[in-house]
A protein has these predicted regions:
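A short aromatic-anchored loop/beta-hairpin motif
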Residues: 1-123, 127-183
Length: 183
């Protein structure tokens, strides 16, 4: 199995899990020990305003009227930030040359200053897999994988990310429908 770090996982209709159905996951780590990713197309009820007001900082323009994404059902008490450029942070891992995952508070403070981080997605919680678990789910056709695209990740509204990720594979959502109609 290829390393799926810096890929999107796209849920197929065979994945009937109520949380992950219809999800696009940005894979932040995939190795022999397991995998970690963030759902990037399902909003939480938490407004970005609340994140910045919690640290007494103004909300940057790019985050006004935005919601924190529901990154996954694991560690839902923890925040995760996927951002570009990478930069130097207290708790961060590089995903590729331009994108990193950071879990330390210092990035939120710098996001408020609007001077270091160009683009970012904030999530609560994450998705994680034990060693071999993701590979089994891929064999069961629960997920489609495609190299990630920064435009889809950072620039598209969350509700357009599923369709756009599928389009990278030349697939329209209707092509994945479980049951065809009868004429």
């Amino acid at each position: 199995m290829d390393n799926l770090t810096d890929h999107f996982l796209i849920a197929t209709p065979s994945l009937e899990d109520p949380f992950f159905g219809g999800s696009v996951i940005y894979m932040c780590r995939h190795d022999g020990d397991g995998a970690l990713g963030l759902v990037i197309n399902k909003p939480s009820p938490i407004p970005m305003d609340a994140v910045f007001s919690a640290i007494d900082k103004p909300v940057p323009e790019q985050f006004r009227s935005s919601l924190v994404m529901m990154g996954g059902p694991v560690q839902i008490d923890r925040g995760f930030v996927v951002h570009s450029p990478c930069g130097e942070w207290q708790s961060s891992i590089a995903i590729n040359a331009d994108t990193a995952l950071t879990t330390s508070r210092d990035i939120i403070e710098r996001l408020a200053e609007n001077d270091v981080v160009g683009k970012a997605i904030l999530t609560i919680g994450c998705a994680s897999w034990d060693a071999g678990q993701l590979e089994r789910e891929l064999e069961e056709n629960s997920w489609l994988a495609v190299p990630a695209d920064g435009n889809i990740l950072f620039d598209l509204p969350f509700h357009e990310r599923y369709r756009a990720a599928l389009a990278k594979l030349g697939i329209e959502p209707v092509m994945l429908m479980r049951e065809a109609g009868h004429a």
